[in-house]
Amino acid sequence: MQTCISKQKELTFDDIINYYSKGENQNKRIGLEYERISIDSKTFKQAKFESLFEIIKEFSKINGFELIYDNETIIGAKNNEGSSISLEPGGQFELSLAPKEKLYNVHFAAQNYISQIDYIAEKYGIKFFAIGNQPKTTFNEMEILNKRRYKIMAGYLPTIGRLAPVMMRETAGVQINLDYKNSVDAKRKIKAAILISPFLTGFFANSPFRENKLTKYKSIRALAWKYTGPDRCNLFYKGIIDYTYKNIYELYANYILDVPMIFISRENNYLELNGKITFRDFMKEGYKGLYATMEDYLVHQSLCFPDVRLKNCIEIRNHDSQNLDVAVGIGAIYKGLLYNDNAIDKILDYFAPLTSSDLEDYGFLAAKFGVNFNVEKLNTKAFEIVKKLLYLAQFNLEADEQKYLDWLIDLVNSKRCIADIILDGVKNNL
């Protein structure tokens, strides 16, 4: 890889803070990023990439999407309105929707695209499973998408997290994106989302199977993320919970700057770093004649994987994949909770006794038990907490959007999570 001879404008901390400031807006939109597991319908193993490429091409031709390549490899497609489809490392198929104000419009747009994708996929013998983990194929049997950053990540991440290969190749999730008005609003939303994250992780646990058999966990996906890398996953920016601070942009950026870098990209080439320096080091000193740019920072922060991530929106990422109705229901929960100041106040007050260490512990319990574990600090059970959250969210939704939570409320009233439905079905068929 050739290094740069002339130094570009030095990237400053203020540049990074300005990036987050430019994300501010007064909207109250819901963005949905929806991954599903790609399965060969005959073998129930990982789908072949060649078939997935054909699905992308055919879908793009119908909908006027532009194909996205990494060198010669198709990695996705996008339209000019902000929606896209893409492939994850193990062939997980992701639909990313442009954010919308109304949940109905999110649901309609997603259903329209998904029905097309599924129809095309049937011709290639492919099915997409809305679950959190590959049920049969394990990472050591799987191909990885021929995308250069994935190949580099696949080499580095297992050195810092023993389940990183599981996370990369086997898992699929639901991500909800929210707007923020300013740094204070972003801080409140992010903190509230983090405080409730282990309990919603448990409620939406949907990956009890791996290697074609039941595991001891209700969310293998959540467990895998716990062992992917403590310096870049889960709640690595603990200060948001454990001490008082003024500006969330500064707090978050400082944590991102201290995360080790995986690679630097220049002119379609990659220089592997594999954790040798942090981004703060790169900003101060450069590396082999290269100097930090804003694009470098954006790539670097995208390689940090907390459950709640700040970009030019707030990304909430801690849910196993679900059927579409449930995925939209997840969006409904956050719309009802985090676009209402009174609801945020109630969350911050109720969960105030919890520390970052508590949240980490409850995250492990959620992965194993779903919603059936004690929350001793709050003197209650996890399913009781989820029940409170769902009723609060439904109360704050518009009348025509409350229906998205009806079934979920029935489920939590039965003291069960999504995975329990699968497990009950297995027991009934024994």
Q: Predicted segments — roles?
A:
Residues G90, L97-A98, L103-V106, A110-S115, ...:
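Membrane helical hairpin/interfacial module
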Residues L97, A130-Q134, Y180, F204:
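Glycine-rich, histidine-containing beta strand-loop boundary motifs that form or position
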Residues M1-G91, A98, V184-K189, L195, ...:
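C-terminal accessory/tail domains of diverse enzymes
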Residues A121-I131:
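Carboxylate/His-rich catalytic cores and anion/metal-binding grooves
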Residues I30, D118-E122:
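Anion (oxyanion) recognition and catalysis
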Residues F129-R148, I194-L200, N212-T215:
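Long, hydrophobic, well-ordered secondary-structure blocks that form the structural core
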Residues N146-M167:
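Acidic, His- and aromatic-enriched active-site or binding-groove loops in soluble protein domains
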